[in-house]
């Protein structure tokens, strides 16, 4: 049988919308089973809606996810990361609502992307009810980190690098972040693959064979293209990890942070002029500095959390109050920086994507 995208040509708007929303509807019961709490009215507040007192987000479904995450006892750093992701999701959804009112998302493409992004968040933090969605909980290096990689190839490379004597402690910390970034890319690839598979099954279930010739699956074709790009990035990432693990870091490294390295590699193959590429390089330097600052606050937050637990075990009210105040300040600063990093990453990624699309 021919591939789905070769067998379809046009899609009625209503059927397309149902299909695009299908992956979110298929999220396992722990998330989807909240009944009326996830009704359209409560998920899509009025434009002027403001946060209720004591709530983290303006959208009720995001507040529910936040409360669920806190019950899962995620680490402070993971919670701060989730908070930043949900803030980005909220911003994008509220912006989309404005576009929808103006009739600028008639085909539902932007709505489908929002659904996909939320699915990624659910999977990334283990909020989708699945047992296989655990990810590494810390950017910090510790004695048992190799057990968190979950891939024999990565564990072997990490062990080789750690025992080679070619890396300083700072370089090992840097290399560990590269391993984490690589693992996260694999995880998100699997999430996208799963979402795409369920969407393709939706075509089969929603439409009769006679309808199939009239459906154009542009959305699925776009996701297939995204899968190929991600797989290419994964393969390049593994090649880099192998090279660095065996040879160590060279003296002429352009950038150090994995996300910045990925962006720079993509930018060099995009349709940028020489002047635009140089401008992008300078912006990446600023972005890397922002990431390093965020990493610093993440480490301080972890240290503060451990210290607070120690003080609480002793039971000194004055020390508890002082340490809790410091912890809360660090937590808020880490959330704020995390949001800025993710927003900046989103903006830079969009610019590279547009440049690569223009080239095609």
From Swiss-Prot:
Motif Prevents secretion from ER, chain ranges: 357-360
Taxonomic superkingdom: Eukaryota
Localization annotation: Rough endoplasmic reticulum lumen; Endoplasmic reticulum-Golgi intermediate compartment lumen; Golgi apparatus, cis-Golgi network; Golgi apparatus lumen
Regions annotated as coiled coil: 222-302
SUPFAM superfamilies on file: RAP domain-like
Glycosylation sites: 271
Entry-annotated residues carrying Phosphoserine: 53, 138
InterPro entries linked to this entry: A2-macroglobuin_RAP, Alpha_2_MRAP_C, MG_RAP_rcpt_1, RAP_D2, RAP_D3, RAP_sf
Gene Ontology cellular component annotations, sorted alphabetically: cell surface; cis-Golgi network; endomembrane system; endoplasmic reticulum-Golgi intermediate compartment; endosome; endosome lumen; Golgi apparatus; Golgi lumen
GO molecular function, one term: very-low-density lipoprotein particle receptor binding
Region (LDL receptor binding), start-end ranges: 240-356
Keyword hit for Endoplasmic reticulum: yes
CDD domains: RAP_D1, RAP_D2, RAP_D3
Signal peptide: 1-33
Family as reported in the entry's similarity comment: Belongs to the alpha-2-MRAP family.
Role played: Molecular chaperone for LDL receptor-related proteins that may regulate their ligand binding activity along the secretory pathway.
Quaternary data: Interacts with the LRP1/alpha-2-macroglobulin receptor heavy and light chains; the interaction is transient and coincides with a reduction of ligand binding by the receptor. Interacts with LRP2/glycoprotein 330. Interacts with LRP1B; binding is followed by internalization and degradation. Interacts with LDLR. Interacts with SORL1. Interacts with LRP1; this interaction is followed by rapid internalization.
Protein name: Alpha-2-macroglobulin receptor-associated protein
């Amino acid at each position: 049988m021919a591939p789905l995208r070769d067998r379809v040509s046009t899609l009625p708007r209503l059927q397309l919308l149902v299909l695009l929303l299908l992956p979110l509807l298929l999220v396992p019961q722990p998330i989807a089973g909240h009944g009326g709490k996830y009704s359209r009215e409560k998920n899509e507040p009025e434009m002027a809606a403001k946060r209720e007192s004591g709530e983290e987000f303006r959208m009720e479904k995001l507040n529910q996810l936040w409360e669920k995450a806190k019950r899962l006892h995620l680490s402070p750093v993971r919670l701060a990361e989730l908070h930043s992701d949900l803030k980005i999701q909220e911003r994008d959804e509220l912006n989309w609502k404005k576009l929808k009112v103006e009739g600028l998302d008639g085909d539902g493409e932007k709505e489908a992307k929002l659904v996909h992004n939320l699915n990624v968040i659910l999977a990334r933090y283990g909020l989708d009810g699945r047992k296989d969605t655990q990810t590494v909980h810390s950017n910090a290096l510790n004695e048992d980190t190799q057990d968190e990689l979950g891939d024999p190839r990565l564990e072997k490379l990490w062990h080789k690098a750690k025992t080679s004597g070619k890396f300083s402690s700072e370089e090992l910390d840097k290399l560990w972040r590269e391993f984490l970034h690589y693992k996260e890319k694999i995880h998100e690839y699997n999430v996208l693959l799963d979402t795409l598979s369920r969407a393709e099954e939706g075509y089969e279930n929603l439409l009769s064979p006679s309808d199939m010739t009239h459906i154009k699956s542009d959305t699925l074709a776009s996701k297939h293209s995204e899968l190929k790009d991600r797989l290419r990035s994964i393969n390049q990432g593994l090649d880099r990890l192998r090279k660095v693990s065996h040879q160590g870091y060279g003296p002429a490294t352009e950038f150090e942070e994995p996300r910045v390295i990925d962006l720079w590699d993509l930018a060099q193959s995009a349709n940028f002029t020489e002047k635009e590429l140089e401008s992008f390089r300078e912006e990446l330097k600023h972005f890397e500095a922002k990431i390093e600052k965020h990493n610093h606050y993440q480490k301080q937050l972890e240290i503060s959390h451990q210290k607070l637990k120690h003080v609480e075990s002793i039971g000194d009210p004055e020390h508890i109050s002082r340490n809790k105040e410091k912890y809360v300040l660090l937590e808020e600063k880490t959330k704020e920086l995390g949001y800025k990093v993710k927003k900046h990453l989103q903006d830079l990624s969009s610019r590279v994507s547009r440049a690569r699309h223009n080239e095609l």
